[in-house]
């Protein structure tokens, strides 16, 4: 799939922008705070329905304006999508796909698939379990919208259950109904996550072996907070989940919080048997994330039948020449949007299919 055109009105620092994109490599060059990342943010917003930089729609609206408009024209193998979003200062955003208003955010997912790679992605390795769960949830939701709905439902049930536990802290409390609901939805999430991690772990391992010339082996392991076996069915997981909720009931009442479930899941990243978070160098951590992102491209391709659009936000300059070469090699069949402050460090001399853009204060022109 490719993005043919992008239109922005009062989005971030763009009062008016109409841009035709190259079907392969698009490079946006400019100093900091000129609007390069804003272009990627608009594309991400069109795919996911929210920003990767802020949780507040108002921050994406041009100063002193009441509404921002984003339009992305997507060409897929067998059809086209026209995605439009209107962000409002004082009310919810409006989203249309092919002129049809969407009632729920989840209906947007899958109309445009993207993979984002930014310096912030090192958090997947370096920071806490919440960052890794966010990564899992975001990727599965793109290829399985049902997962997105189940996740929202699970979080609502979890929130209510935690309120009860907190309000009745230390007291006897009948949680049977809440336990059943949490286990039913939670088991479904665990199945999705287990299958996703199995697939992406295999792909990331292959990518990592290639990038490191076979010297390093990357292993990604799903750590479910509910005890599961490889071939457990959703019903077996549900039963096990319920059992663990019952076993932790006294401790949950004492602490006033739910201690078991997908909201406590994690991932382990190991290189040659050692945990990357603790023992990996900065270079190894970057390579692990690069391998993960390349694996995402292949996984989405296998799931939807075509490559997603790749967004690279100021990461090329952080990769050495070999890793740049490995990344560029995998971009031959992928439309890519790259931001950078300088063109010189990028190893793109031999790349013929590309468009270069200069970004200055919310204006985009050809790079001369």
Swiss-Prot record:
GO annotation, biological process: DNA replication; DNA synthesis involved in DNA repair; double-strand break repair; SOS response
Binding, ATP: 30-37
Record family assignment: Belongs to the RecF family.
Protein name per UniProt: DNA replication and repair protein RecF
Biological source species: Alkaliphilus metalliredigens (strain QYMF)
Gene: recF
InterPro entries on file: DNA-binding_RecF, DNA-binding_RecF_CS, P-loop_NTPase, RecF/RecN/SMC_N, RecF_2
PROSITE patterns linked: RECF_1, RECF_2
Keywords linked to the UniProt accession: ATP-binding, Cytoplasm, DNA damage, DNA repair, DNA replication, DNA-binding, Nucleotide-binding, SOS response
GO CC, alphabetical: cytoplasm
GO molecular function, one term: single-stranded DNA binding
Task performed by this protein: The RecF protein is involved in DNA metabolism; it is required for DNA replication and normal SOS inducibility. RecF binds preferentially to single-stranded, linear DNA. It also seems to bind ATP.
Cell compartments where the protein resides: Cytoplasm
């Amino acid at each position: 799939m490719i993005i043919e055109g992008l239109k922005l009105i009062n989005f971030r620092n763009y009062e008016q922008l109409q841009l035709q994109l190259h079907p392969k490599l698009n490079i946006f060059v400019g100093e900091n705070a000129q609007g390069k990342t804003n272009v990627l943010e608009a594309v991400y917003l069109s795919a996911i329905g929210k920003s990767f930089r802020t949780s507040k729609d108002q921050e994406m609206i041009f100063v002193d304006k009441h509404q921002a408009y984003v339009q992305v024209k997507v060409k897929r193998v067998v059809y086209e999508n026209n995605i439009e979003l209107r962000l409002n200062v004082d009310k919810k955003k409006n989203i249309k796909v092919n002129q049809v208003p969407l009632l729920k955010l989840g209906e947007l997912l899958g109309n445009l698939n993207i993979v984002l790679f930014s310096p912030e992605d090192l958090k997947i390795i370096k920071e806490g379990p919440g960052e890794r769960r966010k990564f899992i949830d975001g990727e599965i939701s793109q290829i399985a919208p049902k997962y997105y709905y189940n996740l929202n439902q699970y979080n609502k049930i979890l929130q209510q259950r935690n309120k009860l536990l907190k309000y009745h802290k230390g007291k006897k409390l009948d949680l049977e109904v809440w336990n059943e609901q949490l286990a039913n939805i939670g088991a479904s999430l665990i199945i999705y996550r287990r299958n996703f991690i199995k697939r992406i772990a295999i792909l990331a391992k292959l990518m990592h072996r290639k990038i490191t010339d076979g010297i390093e082996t990357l292993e990604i392991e799903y750590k479910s907070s509910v005890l599961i076996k490889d071939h457990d069915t959703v019903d077996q997981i549900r039963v096990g989940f319920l059992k663990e909720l019952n076993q932790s009931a006294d401790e949950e009442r004492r602490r006033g919080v739910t201690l078991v479930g997908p909201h406590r899941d994690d991932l382990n990243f190991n290189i040659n048997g050692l945990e990357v978070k603790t023992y990996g160098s900065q270079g190894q951590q970057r390579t692990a994330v690069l391998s993960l992102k390349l694996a995402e491209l292949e996984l989405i391709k296998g799931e939807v039948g075509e490559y997603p659009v790749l967004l690279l936000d100021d990461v090329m300059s952080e990769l050495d020449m070999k890793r740049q070469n490995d990344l560029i090699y995998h971009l031959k069949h992928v439309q890519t949007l790259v931001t950078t402050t300088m063109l010189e460090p990028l190893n793109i001399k031999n790349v013929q299919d590309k468009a270069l853009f200069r970004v200055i204060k919310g204006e985009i022109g050809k790079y001369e």
